[in-house]
């Protein structure tokens, strides 16, 4: 059987991975096998949490819009009813923009919301 010499390539690969493990506790930063397992786990969580962050932001935006409806319009309308009114009046504004308007400029949020609610028959 022939001898395969790729020691230099393997060392480079290990060095590259170990350099990404700096600052970790215990053998995770020194030993290749345990560190590699932690690196794979860290990459998995990084991917998963990038997806999770989007969902958390959406829930934050919906909560802000719902709070703005209750505070500025003094009605107990829910977010989903408000969104259905937006669709009926063909006002296309995304969740992020609505929540930013609510946080930064509350008067314009109420000016945006009142005509929509009046056009659907809700008295304010």
UniProtKB/Swiss-Prot annotation:
Task performed by this protein: Binds directly to 23S ribosomal RNA and is necessary for the in vitro assembly process of the 50S ribosomal subunit. It is not involved in the protein synthesizing functions of that subunit.
Species of provenance: Euglena gracilis
Pfam families linked: Ribosomal_L20
InterPro entries in alphabetical order: Ribosomal_bL20 (IPR005813), RIBOSOMAL_L20_CS (IPR049946), Ribosomal_protein_bL20_C (IPR035566)
Keyword rRNA-binding: yes
GO biological process assignments: ribosomal large subunit assembly; translation
Family: Belongs to the bacterial ribosomal protein bL20 family.
Primary localisation category: plastid
GO cellular component: chloroplast; ribonucleoprotein complex; ribosome
NCBIfam families documented for this protein: rplT_bact
GO MF, one example: structural constituent of ribosome
Gene (UniProt): rpl20
Subcellular location: Plastid, Chloroplast
HAMAP family the UniProt entry points to: Ribosomal_bL20
Record's protein name: Large ribosomal subunit protein bL20c
Lineage: Eukaryota, Discoba, Euglenozoa, Euglenida, Spirocuta
Domain of life according to the entry: Eukaryota
Keyword list, A-Z: Chloroplast, Plastid, Ribonucleoprotein, Ribosomal protein, RNA-binding, rRNA-binding
PROSITE patterns: RIBOSOMAL_L20
